[in-house]
Amino acid sequence: MSDSTTIALLSGGLDSATAAALAIEAGQKVIGLSFDYGQRHRKELQAAEELAACMGLTEHHVISVNLGSWGGSSLTDLTQTVPSEGVVDGVIPNTYVPGRNTVFIAIGLSLAEARHANRLVLGVNAMDYSGYPDCRPDYLKAYQSLADLANKAGREGHGIKLWAPLMHWHKKRIVQEALRLGVPIDKTWSCYSGGDHACGICDSCRIRDAALSEAGRSDLCSKPAP
C-alpha cells in the first residue's frame, strides 16, 4: 500500500460514510473497517457492506469484538431501553458503549500499520453527540499522543494521523457534504432500535431526520414500518 492510504472506521451510518467520502475526495485509497460488537442494530453492518461496494473501497474488513458480552449500554444489552427523549446536556446517554471507540481505534491503527496507511478517519462529531466521552477533541488529541508512541510507524517519525473531519460540524452540514460528495444516503443506517425499519423516534433517527429536513431532503427521512 502507498502512503496515500486511509483506514475508514465505517459503521454503516451517515457520519462515517461522509468521512470516508472526504478521504476519497482527497485522493486517498480507502480501506473500510467495520465491527460486529454485539450491537442490537446489526442492520448497520449490512449498510456498511453496501456502502463499501458502492463507494469503491479498496478493501472492507468486518471484525468481531463482542462488547455485548458484558453489556453496559442499551445498544448491547437488550434489557435496557434505547432513549427517545432527546439528548440532555451534560448527561452521558445509555447508548454510550463502554470503551467502544478506544477498542475500534486500536484495531484500526493495527490495520493501518499493517497496510502502511498514513491516516485513520473517523466520523465522530462533538457537536451533536457531546454526551459521548470518546467523541470529543480532547479524547482524540490524547489518543493521538498514545498512537505516536505505541507503534513502529510513530517511533520512526511517520505516525498514523487520527483524522476526524466532522468533529466541529453540525448534522445539517454533514448532510450537505454527503449530498455534495454523492454519498448514497439511502443506503446508510442510523437507527439504534434494532428493527428492520428505522424507528424514527430514537435519538439517532431524530437527529438525522431533522438534519435531512433542514437540508431539503425529507424524502430520505426515516420511514417506520406501518
Curated annotation (Swiss-Prot):
Cofactor(s) this protein requires: Zn(2+)
Pathway info: Purine metabolism; 7-cyano-7-deazaguanine biosynthesis
UniProt xrefs under Gene3D superfamilies: HUPs (3.40.50.620)
Keywords: ATP-binding, Ligase, Metal-binding, Nucleotide-binding, Queuosine biosynthesis, Zinc
Alphabetical list of SUPFAM superfamilies matching this protein: Adenine nucleotide alpha hydrolases-like
Entry note: cofactor: Binds 1 zinc ion per subunit.
Main enzyme class: ligase
InterPro entries: QueC (IPR018317), Rossmann-like_a/b/a_fold (IPR014729)
Entry annotated with the keyword Zinc: yes
Coiled coil (residue ranges): none
Annotated positions binding ATP: 10-20
UniProt cross-references to Pfam families, sorted A to Z: QueC
Catalyzed chemical reaction(s): 7-carboxy-7-deazaguanine + NH4(+) + ATP = 7-cyano-7-deazaguanine + ADP + phosphate + H2O + H(+)
GO BP annotations listed: queuosine biosynthetic process
Binding locations of Zn(2+): 191, 199, 202, 205
Similarity comment: Belongs to the QueC family.
Known function: Catalyzes the ATP-dependent conversion of 7-carboxy-7-deazaguanine (CDG) to 7-cyano-7-deazaguanine (preQ(0)).
Name of this protein: 7-cyano-7-deazaguanine synthase
Species this chain originates from: Prochlorococcus marinus (strain MIT 9303)
Gene that this polypeptide is encoded by: queC
